[in-house]
UniProtKB/Swiss-Prot annotation:
SUPFAM superfamilies: Amidase signature (AS) enzymes (SSF75304)
Protein name: Glutamyl-tRNA(Gln) amidotransferase subunit A
PROSITE patterns per the UniProt record, alphabetical: AMIDASES
This protein's GO CC annotations: glutamyl-tRNA(Gln) amidotransferase complex
Regions crossing the membrane: none
Annotated family: Belongs to the amidase family. GatA subfamily.
Reaction(s) catalysed by this chain's protein: L-glutamyl-tRNA(Gln) + L-glutamine + ATP + H2O = L-glutaminyl-tRNA(Gln) + L-glutamate + ADP + phosphate + H(+)
Function: Allows the formation of correctly charged Gln-tRNA(Gln) through the transamidation of misacylated Glu-tRNA(Gln) in organisms which lack glutaminyl-tRNA synthetase. The reaction takes place in the presence of glutamine and ATP through an activated gamma-phospho-Glu-tRNA(Gln).
Length: 482
């Protein structure tokens, strides 16, 4: 499937119609879905309706934006009016939202074609998409392996060319880690840059919506479309949004890059370390100056996150009581109905995180756990602040390993949590981070390089990511799907 700019050119030159592009995407989904299972819901009627409207605009010689007529997948934790939004949970099995999320509304208004809602770990809690209450998504590079998570459906859909781009959400690495495992580009923007209105909350101080694409330019285009102030989101930043494509510079002359020392230690696969080091050498060859940077509190990100995120989740998920929507288990009393509904509706990982969160917020433990974790969070942010005094962009592996086999870590939550070791501190500090493909292991599984910049400096990520991408061929590789 071509890039956004290539498809846009074909549309305005009338070489292809939006309906033809959409039909091709829907046919690809029909052919690939039995193997990959990226989507929970295919929105063919709405997609073709949007595509027809784009074709009518072109016929009337009206100007269209870059995303008009472009097939896009939406993670199924973003509210879509009249279309099921399950969050990958049985508790929301029959839920059809009465309102549209800000990001999907923005995309709808510019004519982007939503082809479906993608699979995810239940309520975005997980790193493999195995926690979905409906199906397990496969990694397009090896169908026996996981695509990462929690936005595994979106990453797999883009890698398998079922859509051109997709939206995911990232609370502790849920865009960047699956992007790494599926060999695509994934961006977590600065906290507050993209509206969270209509995103079903997991960890409200950490969640952020961002794009997946096969190229850095595609991701930059989508970010430009979804970013911006929204009065419906109190954490939304009131700032002008630049044209992110202006940062796509193939030269890195004058760019200072820091290698986060703490990420090259225990638990990192040797092939991942070797591949990432080669990528760093390439950045140097493109003109960047490289130095080693210490972020001493980086390693405490994981334990701090697994106190803060479950604490916020336990409060956010208290609203699922079956009174007004979702599945309901009948019972003699209201309390019994709550208990039976939540016991049946939530999966084991969600229950685990609710329990952890309830415990850490309870009297007698709040100061010892939650408050201490928030203090650690502040120290991690201070480490990043100090690092950005001397460098423009920080680099490290996105994930300590390549994709693991489905079922391999389901009985070992701690091992699963370690998948987000490199990505979590970026969320805790509210910074933008992007994963770009930088090679493959001996089994042909993708490896990602994580780029991190200071608050609201996504442009620097696009500069470094684009320069690296244009000087390599990794983004052109395609999974061996039949």
């Amino acid at each position: 499937m071509a890039s956004i700019r290539e498809l846009h050119q074909q549309l305005i030159n009338k070489e292809r119609s939006a309906v033809e592009i959409t039909t091709e995407a829907l046919e690809r989904i029909a052919a690939i879905e039995p193997q990959v299972k990226s989507f929970l819901c295919i929105t063919a009627d709405r997609a073709l309706e949007t595509a027809k409207a784009v074709d009518q605009k072109i016929a009337a010689k009206e100007e269209i934006g870059l995303l008009a007529g472009i097939p896009i997948g939406i993670k199924d934790n973003m509210s879509t009016k009249g279309i099921p939004t399950t969050c990958g949970s049985r508790i929301l099995e029959n839920f059809i939202p009465p309102y549209e999320s800000t990001v999907t509304q923005k995309l709808q208004e510019i004519g982007a074609v939503m082809v479906g809602k993608t699979n995810l770990d239940e309520f975005a809690m997980g790193s493999s998409t195995e926690n979905s209450g409906y199906q397990v998504t496969a990694n397009p590079w090896d169908l026996e392996r996981v695509p990462g998570g929690s936005s595994g459906g979106s990453a797999a859909a883009v890698a398998a060319e079922e859509c051109v781009v997709a939206l995911g959400s990232d609370t502790g690495g849920s865009i960047r880690q699956p992007a790494s495992l599926c060999g695509v580009v994934g961006l977590k923007p600065t906290y507050g840059l993209v509206s969270r209105f209509g995103l079903v909350a997991y960890g409200s101080s950490l969640d952020q919506i961002g794009p997946f694409g096969r190229t850095v330019e595609d991701v930059a285009i989508v970010l430009g479309a979804i970013a911006g102030y929204d009065a419906k989101d109190s954490t939304s930043l009131k700032l002008p949004i630049p044209d992110y494509t202006t940062f796509l510079n193939p030269s890195l002359k004058g760019v200072k890059i820091g290698i986060i020392e703490e990420t090259f230690g225990e638990g990192l696969d040797s092939i991942v370390a070797e591949t990432v080091n080669k990528a760093i050498e390439q950045l140097q060859a493109l003109g960047a100056t490289i130095e080693r940077i210490s972020c001493p509190r980086f390693r405490y990100g994981l334990p701090a996150y697994y106190i803060i995120a479950p604490s916020e989740a336990s409060a956010n998920l208290a609203r699922y009581d079956a009174v007004k929507y979702g599945i309901r288990e009948e019972a003699a009393t209201l309390l019994e109905m709550y208990n039976k509904t939540r016991a049946k509706g939530f999966g084991s990982e969600v229950k685990r995180r609710i329990m952890i969160g309830t415990y850490t917020l309870s009297a007698g433990y709040y100061d010892a756990y939650y408050l201490k974790a928030q203090k650690v969070r502040t120290l991690i942010k201070q480490d990043f602040d100090k690092a950005f005094e001397s460098v423009d962009v920080l680099v490290c592996p996105t994930s300590p390993t390549t994709a693991f086999k489905a079922g391999e870590k389901t009985d070992d939550p701690l091992s699963m949590y370690l998948s987000d070791l490199m990505t979590i501190p970026v969320n805790l500090a509210g910074l933008p981070g992007m994963s770009i493909p930088c090679g493959f292991d001996q089994q042909g599984l993708p490896i990602g390089l994580q780029l991190v910049s200071n608050v609201l400096e996504e442009g620097k990520l696009f500069n470094v990511g684009y320069a690296y991408e244009q000087s390599t061929e990794w983004h052109k590789q395609k999974p061996p799907l039949k």
